[in-house]
Amino acid sequence: MARRNRGRSGAVIRGPLAPFAGDYEIQLRARGYSSRSVVCEVRYLARLSQWMENCRLNAADLNVERIDEFLGGLPRRRDGGRVCSRRGLIQILGVLDDSGVLCPQAEKPASPSEVLLASFERFLLQERAVAPSTAVVYVARARRFLDWCAPNAELGGLTANDVINAVLRVSASASPSTTKLFVSALRSFLRFSFVEGLTPNELSAAALSVPRRRRSSPPMGIDRRAADALLRSCDRRRSVGRRDYAILLVLLRLGLRAGEVGGLCLQDFDWRAGEVTVHGKGGRVHRLPLPTDVGEAIVAYLRRGRPNGAARREAFLRVVAPTGPLGTNGISRVVRCACSRAGVPMVRAHRLRHTLACQMVEVGVALPEIALVLRHSSLSSSVEYARVDIQALRAVAQPWPGGDR
């Protein structure tokens, strides 16, 4: 069998994976693994290759199931963790695929429902310009509707009663907000079906609106002391601290949504003009001024925090290999961790957006200007913040009839 001596790791790789050890190491380094981690991962690869040789397996036989089988036969550490890294070993599959070793697996023919849902997703992304995360949510709701009313994706016999019953079925066990989301997705799917000629009638109106009471409490941000505590909790002597500090400052000073922060790319920053391009909801693109302190924090992270040689164009990346974009969940996790470090009540990233709006209300900024800063498509979204300034509301409140008697 092929043999390759890994002088740096001290591991001798025997078996079917030996010829690919060099490319595997290159890929690990490209994904942000440290030299020490690369040594460990190569040793894990040597154990996997030896196991495959004992099982009389070729490199083309390797897949995720084989890797899990190999890991399942290894003893666990005292803390219950694996002695080998599953995340690292799975990356050998990419090396084998790039080398043309792996045979392309025959894909199962998609069902009529999945074909229809794939077409609906393309419609959402290309025609409606919705965010990819929103498209995923809408497709999931449309899939549930099809499972109930048209398992074979035959929509010609669909009636308004079918639509109404589906909404009632969801509302019987879900919250008003969840039901409202289902109705929005269902209406979009029914409009798509009519446009494509799949239904003889436009049935979206049959998905009745869900009454939702206006929330009794005004939108709440966090006070300045808590905001300062979040920023101070970041250890800017470390890479992760510089990254988290920049993220928190972007959320607090620009009022971006978590997904918008996670989607920021290097080319979105115009350093000469002092502006940043934000890709918002509905495919809308906005150019915002970049405050000096925010720009300095981002530059400090890019120079002395962002993984060197990262091929990704997203600005904010994971610190732990394999490097990749944080995304919406990662940005929210940064906020939660900062709350835990600072000892302040746990909040989500969107509360920091509310914080900016509340601060603008406190200093007398008009609602149209708040809507402009937060990039609300409708002024009604900003009207909620009018309830934040209680003193101003008292000044314009009318006396209760007969209240002075």
Where are these regions (language model features)?
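Conserved catalytic core of the tyrosine transesterase superfamily
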Residues: M1-R405
